[in-house]
């Protein structure tokens, strides 16, 4: 069995930066409180928790005087202010690409546009971006969800950084026909684009694809969807222990693609297990 690895794959710049920033602070501080999971990979969060990371759901759970951490997905301005009232030090791990999307949302709303975000309204990154819009803001996952009230409105459109390019392009195309004026910012990050392209390319060369990453990772889910759309048999697993030996039978070439929040050590574990089978 031949194993081919998507290139690029695994940790993106923003997640690497967040982990490195968090690790530096953990080396100096016994406990660091993160508002929400710093990244979407349960195994890596477990490792960081052993170093002193504490994940909380609300600023009110952060003890007064404790060090706080802003996750890679970012948070709303209101949440940041709530942390500031409790923490003398806030370590900001927000991905720079997410920061750009936040700034675009703020600018568009100040210019009088209805801010339209292409993405998942339940995702923390999207919720954070929404907080920067000072006026009307709506999140749409597909063109079928566009409400009638937006017909004839000036709309400013941007994207969740991990959105599929095709989904974003389709949504923009629809707004061209219903809005008298649109302003578009493609805020899909370059790392996402590169990983999506690498999966498309690799899927045509293998007879099975393994997509590795957290179940709560939006970018990993998109990679799994792209692999399946390419027509290759694909499985999505969080770690090597979930790999089904039966799925591997009679497969001669296996492709591996890892989400942008999947650390190298998990990829290495998977390759080692495949080589032992």
Model-derived features: positions:
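The feature marks the mature, well-folded catalytic cores of soluble enzymes
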Residues: 1-277
């Amino acid at each position: 069995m031949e194993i081919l690895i998507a290139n690029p794959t695994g940790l993106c710049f923003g997640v690497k930066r967040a982990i490195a920033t968090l690790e530096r602070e953990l080396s100096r501080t016994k406990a660091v409180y993160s508002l929400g999971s710093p990244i979407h990979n349960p195994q890596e969060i477990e490792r960081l928790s052993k170093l002193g990371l504490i994940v909380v759901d609300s600023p009110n759970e952060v003890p007064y005087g404790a060090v706080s951490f802003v996750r890679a997905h970012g948070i709303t301005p209101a949440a940041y202010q709530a942390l500031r009232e409790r923490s003398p030090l806030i370590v900001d791990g927000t991905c720079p690409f997410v920061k750009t999307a936040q700034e675009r949302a703020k600018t568009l709303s100040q210019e009088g546009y209805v801010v339209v975000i292409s993405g998942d309204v339940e995702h923390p990154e999207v919720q954070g971006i929404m907080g920067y819009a000072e006026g009307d803001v709506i999140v749409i996952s597909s063109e079928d969800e566009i409400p009638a009230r937006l017909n004839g409105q000036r709309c400013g459109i941007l994207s969740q950084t991990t959105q599929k390019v095709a989904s974003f392009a389709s949504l923009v195309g629809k707004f061209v026909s219903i809005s008298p004026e649109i302003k578009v910012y493609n805020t899909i990050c370059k790392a996402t684009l590169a990983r999506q392209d690498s999966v498309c390319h690799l899927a045509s060369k293998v007879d099975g694809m393994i997509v590795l990453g957290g179940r709560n990772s939006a970018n990993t889910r998109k990679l799994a969807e792209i692999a399946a759309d390419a027509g290759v048999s694909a499985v999505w697993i969080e770690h090597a222990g979930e790999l089904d030996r039966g799925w591997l039978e009679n497969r001669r070439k296996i492709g591996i693609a890892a989400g942008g929040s999947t650390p190298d050590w998990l990829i290495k574990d998977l390759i080692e297990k495949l080589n032992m089978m």
